[in-house]
């Protein structure tokens, strides 16, 4: 059995770690509320854009934008959004597993896969994995902006415009609630048709384009892709803070359990030492 002094040192070490994890839990909780506000503020815009684009995809426009044309999928692109920092449980690894499963499905069909990465964890994982990474960005911080993403998104859009990609997907974690974050793979291009059954059933109208659809759609469709990627980044950030808060709370609770166990061991060691001292005193007195 370890000495009482060694056990006291272990208890002190665990207590110091517990203070750190408790502080990280509180910081993550504060940041989570801020990122949730940002996520909820941008969601209506992203969802409205998705509805508008879904309606356009159902329409019969004379001008067929390349983003509306469905091509045979020989080359597939992914924009994968991860966190920059760790200590957030299995958030990133679950996302990577989901992405790898989907990538393998396309690879088995003979499609070439290219990736654009957002976040340091995705960069580290897929560079070591050996994937075909064509663009990457990290260090976005807790308040990302669309301008910081335009470069990475632009690389994939340029490839799609040049016919070097036939599909483009966005991979990110979707915030369900504080305890649940789900990996999601959304198709960005070609534009997915609306899944709204009522819209499909009653699709008897179309937008009026003034003066013509081309200049509007050329701008709108690019903005749509940028808005969806931005929403994915904001959602992933909220997921990161929630997962980190839960992970740090679990670590703090586990540290408390370890301290209680060590305290019990310490008490036993101290009791054994006292008993031994008493035995020695009694033995000495008997000898006298």
From Swiss-Prot:
CDD domains: F1-ATPase_gamma
Subcellular location: Cell inner membrane
Domain of life: Bacteria
InterPro entries linked: ATP_synth_F1_ATPase_gsu (IPR035968), ATP_synth_F1_gsu (IPR000131), ATP_synth_F1_gsu_CS (IPR023632)
GO molecular function terms noted in the UniProt entry: ATP binding; proton-transporting ATP synthase activity, rotational mechanism
GO cellular component terms listed in the entry, alphabetical order: plasma membrane; proton-transporting ATP synthase complex
Topological relation to the membrane, as annotated: Peripheral membrane protein
Alphabetically ordered keywords of this record: ATP synthesis, Cell inner membrane, Cell membrane, CF(1), Hydrogen ion transport, Ion transport, Membrane, Transport
Main location: membrane
Subunit structure: F-type ATPases have 2 components, CF(1) - the catalytic core - and CF(0) - the membrane proton channel. CF(1) has five subunits: alpha(3), beta(3), gamma(1), delta(1), epsilon(1). CF(0) has three main subunits: a, b and c.
Family, per entry: Belongs to the ATPase gamma chain family.
The protein's role, per its UniProt record: Produces ATP from ADP in the presence of a proton gradient across the membrane. The gamma chain is believed to be important in regulating ATPase activity and the flow of protons through the CF(0) complex.
Protein name in UniProt: ATP synthase gamma chain 1
Species of origin: Photobacterium profundum (strain SS9)
Gene coding for it: atpG1
């Amino acid at each position: 059995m370890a000495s009482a002094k060694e056990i006291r040192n272990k208890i002190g070490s665990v207590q110091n770690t517990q203070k750190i994890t408790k502080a990280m839990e509180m910081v993550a909780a504060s940041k989570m509320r801020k990122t949730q506000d940002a996520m909820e503020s941008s969601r209506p815009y992203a969802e409205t854009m998705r509805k508008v684009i879904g309606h356009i995809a159902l329409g019969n426009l004379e001008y067929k934008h390349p983003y509306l044309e469905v091509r045979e999928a020989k080359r597939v692109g992914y924009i994968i959004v991860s966190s920059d920092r760790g200590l957030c449980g299995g958030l990133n690894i679950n996302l990577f597993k989901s992405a790898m499963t989907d990538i393998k499905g396309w690879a088995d069909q003979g499609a070439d896969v290219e990736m654009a990465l957002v976040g340091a964890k995705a960069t580290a994982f897929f560079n070591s994995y050996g994937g075909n990474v064509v663009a990457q960005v990290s260090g976005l911080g807790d308040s990302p902006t669309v301008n910081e993403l335009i470069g990475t998104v632009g690389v994939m859009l340029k490839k799609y415009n040049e016919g070097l990609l036939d599909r483009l997907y966005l991979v990110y974690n979707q915030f369900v609630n504080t305890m649940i974050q789900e990996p999601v793979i959304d198709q960005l291009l070609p534009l997915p048709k609306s899944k709204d059954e009522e819209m499909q059933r009653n699709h008897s109208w179309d937008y009026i384009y003034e003066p013509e659809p081309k200049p509007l759609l050329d701008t709108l469709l690019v903005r749509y892709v940028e808005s969806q990627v931005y929403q994915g980044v904001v959602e992933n950030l909220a997921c990161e803070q929630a997962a980190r808060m839960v992970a740090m709370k679990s670590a703090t609770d586990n540290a408390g359990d370890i301290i209680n166990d060590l305290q019990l061991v310490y008490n036993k060691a101290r009791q054994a030492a006292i008993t031994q001292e008493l035995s020695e005193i009694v033995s000495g007195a008997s000898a006298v």
